[in-house]
Swiss-Prot record:
<feature type="transmembrane region" description="Helical">
    <location>
        <begin position="166"/>
        <end position="186"/>
    </location>
</feature>
<feature type="transmembrane region" description="Helical">
    <location>
        <begin position="31"/>
        <end position="51"/>
    </location>
</feature>
<keyword id="KW-1133">Transmembrane helix</keyword>
<keyword id="KW-0812">Transmembrane</keyword>
<dbReference type="InterPro" id="IPR011527">
    <property type="entry name" value="ABC1_TM_dom"/>
</dbReference>
<dbReference type="GO" id="GO:0055085">
    <property type="term" value="P:transmembrane transport"/>
</dbReference>
<keyword id="KW-0067">ATP-binding</keyword>
<comment type="subunit">
    <text>Homodimer.</text>
</comment>
<keyword id="KW-0472">Membrane</keyword>
<dbReference type="Pfam" id="PF00005">
    <property type="entry name" value="ABC_tran"/>
</dbReference>
<dbReference type="Pfam" id="PF00664">
    <property type="entry name" value="ABC_membrane"/>
</dbReference>
<dbReference type="GO" id="GO:0140359">
    <property type="term" value="F:ABC-type transporter activity"/>
</dbReference>
<feature type="domain" description="ABC transporter">
    <location>
        <begin position="347"/>
        <end position="583"/>
    </location>
</feature>
<dbReference type="InterPro" id="IPR036640">
    <property type="entry name" value="ABC1_TM_sf"/>
</dbReference>
<dbReference type="InterPro" id="IPR003439">
    <property type="entry name" value="ABC_transporter-like_ATP-bd"/>
</dbReference>
<feature type="transmembrane region" description="Helical">
    <location>
        <begin position="68"/>
        <end position="88"/>
    </location>
</feature>
<dbReference type="InterPro" id="IPR017871">
    <property type="entry name" value="ABC_transporter-like_CS"/>
</dbReference>
Amino acid sequence: MQEQKLQENDFSTLQTFKRLWPMIKPFKAGLIVSGVALVFNALADSGLIYLLKPLLDDGFGKANHSFLKMMAFVVVGMIILRGITNFISNYCLAWVSGKVVMTMRRRLFKHLMFMPVSFFDQNSTGRLLSRITYDSQMIASSSSGSLITIVREGAYIISLFAVMFYTSWELTIVLFIIGPIIAVLIRLVSKIFRRLSKNLQDSMGELTSATEQMLKGHKVVLSFGGQHVEEVHFNHVSNDMRRKSMKMVTANSISDPVVQVIASLALATVLYLATTPLIAEDNLSAGSFTVVFSSMLAMMRPLKSLTAVNAQFQSGMAACQTLFAILDLEPEKDDGAYKAEPAKGELEFKNVSFAYQGKDELALNNISFSVPAGKTVALVGRSGSGKSTIANLVTRFYDIEQGEILLDGVNIQDYRLSNLRENCAVVSQQVHLFNDTIANNIAYAAQDKYSREEIIAAAKAAYALEFIEKLPQVFDTVIGENGTSLSGGQRQRLAIARALLRNSPVLILDEATSALDTESERAIQSALEELKKDRTVVVIAHRLSTIENADEILVIDHGEIRERGNHKTLLEQNGAYKQLHSMQFTG
């Protein structure tokens, strides 16, 4: 069985960006427009600096007032150009990043929906929520914010180099010596940022998981006075995240001054060389020197920005790696092509053995039984004996590696997954309802397939109509997340109505009434009997009174069938079933 834990591959920044590029490519028009705007923005900035030479040498140096008046309009025009191009570049890149993040989230969401149950057994909900929300948003930093900075500041530095080289190539050569040193420094810092960013994202997942755990289990926390335990746990993970965040800040804060010091050394060198006779006598005017010196001063800002954006870009790339690690995992195997519309419902287990991932002990050991179409088999036994595992295998929530499970004589692995699950309806102890209307919950995933009359008929058969009609908007009432506004019995009846509407030939009742009180159980027992009619039923029961009429009862213990027969014959055997029966009915 394939391991489904998240393991991030150590790809380089370039390799990761190459994988991200297919998501960016459909929106490359926005990148091109933004790139052109950023180039013009950089030219406007460097052009303003270059204007210092004619202003000083020709305007003020020669007292040319008409020239100075003309230059005033030129400066205003360049500043307007700078503002327009800045807006265009920011808007286009924000549009691109929004599209990329949306695409990634949609791919991730769709991929997660097709992952096997074993994947969710091994990865916490909080961590996965963090991946979809926090990590996917981090991609915006690498596809928008950081790209704006990289392109704009990169173009600005190149244009400043061009201005300096055109004005005085001798002084500009100094920067060609210092440049590679800064590049090497940025490369070294990139690796540090990448590692720290991965650690920070892991901490965010743990923080989300801790929060989600407390919110979902809030009643348990209150009941057992676990506030201190949860507070200590949350304080630990939040402090761990704070420490990792401070490491990022420290690395960023150290890298900036180092780059600034190296750049200032280049500036001081230029200032010193300008005083030497070789350059001073080479027609270096006040305007030319001012342009070179101002260009070098102006270059400090983009150099600092490029160093700072490196941390942002590496965070985005680390987030991409994490998300690609999920997308690289294989979804549920769905190699079958057989379709039964509908199946007759004959179910058979042949020598089935199964173990959960990461466990050596078998959950099921050589299980064999058959259920003729339209008959009911009940599974009873202690908690952890393997009853629910059998139910999960019928719907292929887990795949077996030994034995066969047949539906109408066909191996369930030969069925198309969608068709297999269309032929099986599950009503479990843990009912999940969606934050939607009553009608949409009953007709979940098939709202267009069923009419309102069919939905009402299913609700009536499930004995749910009596409470639905009392709701403010009746079937159009939104019931809140997981049906929080409903009682346990009401939620269970909606689950039964959902199964009735689906009308599948195979029905699995996984302790469907064990969480209810006796009165609620009695209220829905008639609904369950209606649901069982003309169906092959697998019942997992805690209360033996609910399965006395089953055609066959299997007593499961430690993953094996210990006893089998109907209620009467099992009582006569005076074995494990008789012992369970005596415990429930005689105390």
